[in-house]
UniProtKB/Swiss-Prot annotation:
Cofactors (names): a divalent metal cation
Protein's job: Nucleoside triphosphate pyrophosphatase that hydrolyzes dTTP and UTP. May have a dual role in cell division arrest and in preventing the incorporation of modified nucleotides into cellular nucleic acids.
Domain of life: Bacteria
Organism listed in the record: Bordetella avium (strain 197N)
PANTHER family: BIFUNCTIONAL DTTP/UTP PYROPHOSPHATASE/METHYLTRANSFERASE PROTEIN-RELATED (PTHR43213), BIFUNCTIONAL DTTP_UTP PYROPHOSPHATASE_METHYLTRANSFERASE PROTEIN-RELATED (PTHR43213:SF5)
Subcellular location: Cytoplasm
InterPro entries linked to this entry: ITPase-like_fam, Maf-like
Protein name: dTTP/UTP pyrophosphatase
C-alpha cells in the first residue's frame, strides 16, 4: 500500500500502477477476487466498442462492493479495461500459447484499434472516458511470432502483445494514446479526475 493514497485502483495491472505513479498519483491496489475466466465474454450482438466500457464499469462495480465488504476508507475508485479490436472483433487476453500465436497472426500486417475505457467513481458519481488509438503492426514472420511467445510477454495482455515491451519493435505507427495502448490513457484519466474535482500533483 502506498503512503497517503489518494485513490483506489481496481486493477492488478503493473502497467496501470506504473502510469499512475508516473503522474504522481499515490494509490492503493484493490486485489479483487477475479471473475471466472481470463476475460469477460462479449455478449451476443454486443459491439466491441460497448464491450470495453461495460467491462470497465463491471470492474468499478466489483471494486465498490469490495470496498464496502472490507470496510475500507472512502476514496475515489479508478477502474480501466483495454481491448484490441480487429475488424469489429474483440481480441482479449490469450488463453494459451496457441491462442497467442493465432492473435499475433491475425494482427500481423494490420491497422487495428486499441480501446481503453476508464471509469472513476467519486462521491457516488460515475465519470467515464474511452481512449481510441489506431495501431499499425508490421508483418511478422511465423518464427517471430513463435519467438515472441517464447518470451512470455503476450500473456495477460489484450491482443497478445505489449507495446511497451519487446513488441514495441513490431509497431510502425500509432495514432492516439501510447499510454492508452499500455492500459491507462493519462490524458483522459487526468480529465476525469479534474471533472471530479480531484487535483493532480
Amino acid at each position: 500500500m502506498d503512503h497517503c493514497p489518494r485513490l483506489y485502483l481496481a486493477s492488478a495491472s503493473p502497467r496501470r500502477r506504473e502510469l499512475l505513479t508516473q503522474v504522481g498519483l499515490a494509490h492503493t491496489v484493490l486485489h479483487l477476487p477475479a471473475p471466472p475466466g481470463e476475460d469477460e465474454p462479449q455478449w451476443p450482438g454486443e459491439a466491441a466498442a460497448d464491450y470495453v466500457l461495460r467491462t470497465a464499469r463491471d470492474k468499478a462495480q466489483r471494486g465498490q462492493i469490495w470496498m464496502r465488504e472490507q470496510n475500507l476508507p472512502a476514496l475515489p475508485l479508478l477502474a480501466a479495461d483495454t481491448t484490441v479490436i480487429l475488424d469489429g472483433r474483440v481480441l482479449g487476453k490469450p488463453a494459451d500459447r496457441s491462442d497467442a500465436v493465432a492473435m499475433l497472426a491475425a494482427l500481423s500486417g494490420t491497422k487495428h484499434e486499441v480501446r481503453t475505457a476508464v471509469v472513476l467513481v467519486h462521491e457516488d458519481r460515475l465519470y467515464e472516458a474511452v481512449s481510441i488509438t489506431h495501431v499499425s503492426m508490421r508483418a511478422l514472420t511465423a518464427a517471430e511470432r513463435e519467438r515472441y511467445c517464447d518470451s512470455g510477454e503476450p500473456y495477460g495482455k489484450a491482443g497478445a502483445y505489449g507495446i511497451q515491451g519487446l513488441a514495441g519493435s513490431f509497431i510502425s505507427h500509432i495514432d492516439g494514446s501510447y499510454s492508452g495502448v499500455m492500459g491507462l490513457p493519462l490524458f483522459e484519466t487526468a480529465e476525469l479526475l479534474r471533472r471530479a474535482g480531484i487535483a493532480l500533483p
